[in-house]
Amino acid sequence: MDPVLVLVLTLSSLLLLSLWRQSFGRGKLPPGPTPLPIIGNTLQIYMKDIGQSIKKFSKVYGPIFTLYLGMKPFVVLHGYEAVKEALVDLGEEFSGRGSFPVSERVNKGLGVIFSNGMQWKEIRRFSIMTLRTFGMGKRTIEDRIQEEAQCLVEELRKSKGAPFDPTFILGCAPCNVICSIIFQNRFDYKDPTFLNLMHRFNENFRLFSSPWLQVCNTFPAIIDYFPGSHNQVLKNFFYIKNYVLEKVKEHQESLDKDNPRDFIDCFLNKMEQEKHNPQSEFTLESLVATVTDMFGAGTETTSTTLRYGLLLLLKHVDVTAKVQEEIERVIGRNRSPCMKDRSQMPYTDAVVHEIQRYIDLVPTNLPHLVTRDIKFRNYFIPKGTNVIVSLSSILHDDKEFPNPEKFDPGHFLDERGNFKKSDYFMPFSAGKRICAGEALARTELFLFFTTILQNFNLKSLVDVKDIDTTPAISGFGHLPPFYEACFIPVQRADSLSSHL
């Protein structure tokens, strides 16, 4: 048969299939902009900032609407009420993990982030319980974070107040906390293997937020047959995965079943307990995928929040001064901050919350999946439908947070200056897919920020009026623009008295 004829017939079949699927699905799903055959609404979406496109569509179609990314329909939830109703009130039905093809090429549906069904339920439950176990041990997670915070301070002191880009140093600290939990050891900040891992984490988070990766996730065939930055993402993933596998093998050789040292040992013990269960979710492949998930998620999100937060503190010097005054009054300079201090530091607590709200790190979160046919607000959403959750619409809700585009710790303070909780604070998402490391991340952010500001004054290289805090990249994540800063050491009280 003529190759040209084959091509024409193939394209025609795809076109007809696309038209049939779209017309069949649109009668049942929530309304939305009219999709084009094959490419769907892709041309109507600003890939450099999907969140802005979602906000625009919500003004036309309301809090629940449908977008076609390629030939797949995605139901979009916009606003607190719609998101809460779906993720919390109907948590089980919306608990699936949606399509994310680039990551699926690596994890194969295993691990704790991109898995579904029993794999996800059992691995997530085990991971949370194991993290809690370490939190109740002799050397708690808070101890590990405090220790790492002091290592971070010593590394920052080496700059001697000279300007530098803090990206890698701020990435090393949360990564080392995760390493101490998973591998039982931390890295020196100059370790070449560590720096290589940090570079790959940082590069992947940046590339994940690029328009090209959004296109790859929309049209998965690109991943296997076309060149592009997605290949570097996969290369980085496989490097990290192989590194984790080597660490697992080392643990297998030195395992003491009665004295588990870290997360890997606990998982290996679980594998041994279930070795006669052919349906067990606890396999070597699952262990590697889970540790890789924890390694990546526990590093880049926290480090980016730290980096973005310090940029905001550089710009808002009045806010920084108030935090440092509170640190001086409650903690002083001669002991390390601890989580017990937080209840006495409402302003600092509000600042940490406002940083997370303002930067809106992952504006549309990872996609969810409907686990069974469901009627939602008079719409029929069939099992297997992908769901996009707009966290931006909640974190920047102008009714809950007046002037949401303004950085203002007052969003989390009452009229008496006490810390004020908000149900709209959802940087970690909500429901059954809420970030498993939320407690760890909250502890890290409070202790790292307070320890840095206890020991250093921040100085910008440019006038504070010229500091730009708008994201440099707005895709999967909001990444801060490049900046350099000076960390000027604050003299401790004991060093001051020695000079008197």
Swiss-Prot record:
Pathway(s) this gene product operates in, as recorded in its UniProt entry: Lipid metabolism; arachidonate metabolism; Steroid metabolism
InterPro entries with a match to the protein in the record: Cyt_P450, Cyt_P450_CS, Cyt_P450_E_grp-I, Cyt_P450_E_grp-I_CYP2B-like, Cyt_P450_sf, Cytochrome_P450_fam2
GO MF annotation, one: retinoic acid 4-hydroxylase activity
Enzyme Commission number, as recorded: 1.14.14.1
UniProt note on tissues of expression: Liver and kidney; male-specific.
UniProt catalytic activity: an organic molecule + reduced [NADPH--hemoprotein reductase] + O2 = an alcohol + oxidized [NADPH--hemoprotein reductase] + H2O + H(+); testosterone + reduced [NADPH--hemoprotein reductase] + O2 = 2alpha,17beta-dihydroxyandrost-4-en-3-one + oxidized [NADPH--hemoprotein reductase] + H2O + H(+); testosterone + reduced [NADPH--hemoprotein reductase] + O2 = 16alpha,17beta-dihydroxyandrost-4-en-3-one + oxidized [NADPH--hemoprotein reductase] + H2O + H(+); (5Z,8Z,11Z,14Z)-eicosatetraenoate + reduced [NADPH--hemoprotein reductase] + O2 = (8R,9S)-epoxy-(5Z,11Z,14Z)-eicosatrienoate + oxidized [NADPH--hemoprotein reductase] + H2O + H(+)
Top-tier EC class: oxidoreductase
Main location: endoplasmic reticulum
Pfam families in UniProt: p450
Any one Gene Ontology BP term: steroid metabolic process
Stored PANTHER family: CYTOCHROME P450 2C9, CYTOCHROME P450 508A4-RELATED
Annotated function: A cytochrome P450 monooxygenase involved in the metabolism of steroid hormones and fatty acids. Catalyzes the hydroxylation of carbon-hydrogen bonds. Metabolizes testosterone to 2alpha- and 16alpha-hydroxytestosterone. Catalyzes the epoxidation of double bonds of polyunsaturated fatty acids (PUFAs). Converts arachidonic acid (ARA, C20:4(n-6)) primarily to epoxyeicosatrienoic acid (EET) regioisomers, 8,9-, 11,12-, and 14,15-EET, with both R,S and S,R stereochemistry. Preferentially produces 11R,12S-EET enantiomer.
Protein name, UniProt field: Cytochrome P450 2C11
